[in-house]
Amino acid sequence: KEGYPVDWGNCKYECMSDAYCKDLCVDRKAKSGYCYKLNWFCYCEGLPDDSPIKTNGHCRPGGRRK
């Protein structure tokens, strides 16, 4: 699957570089990832089905974990 990876607080990961997002996504067993520069959040492609991605729901800061 693909989408915006989230932390434990359901918050997307902000970014400025593709390298940061690629590392973050690969750590989550994705095939690749990049910084989607229209909104400055990491986007992953090829994630496992059980990997959490952004859906409906609010971000609850304090759950940030790489």
Swiss-Prot record:
Location in the cell: Secreted
Cellular component GO terms, alphabetical: extracellular region
Record key words, sorted: Disulfide bond, Ion channel impairing toxin, Neurotoxin, Secreted, Toxin, Voltage-gated sodium channel impairing toxin
Boundaries of every LCN-type CS-alpha/beta domain copy: 1-60
InterPro entries documented for this protein: LCN-type_CS_alpha_beta_dom, Scorpion_toxin-like, Scorpion_toxin-like_sf, Scorpion_toxinL, Scorpion_toxinL/defensin
Signal peptide (from-to): none
Intrachain S-S bonds: 11-59, 15-35, 21-42, 25-44
PROSITE patterns: LCN_CSAB (PS51863)
Tissue-by-tissue expression: Expressed by the venom gland.
Family label: Belongs to the long (4 C-C) scorpion toxin superfamily. Sodium channel inhibitor family. Alpha subfamily.
Note on domains (UniProt): Has the structural arrangement of an alpha-helix connected to antiparallel beta-sheets by disulfide bonds (CS-alpha/beta).
Protein name: Putative alpha-neurotoxin RjAa16
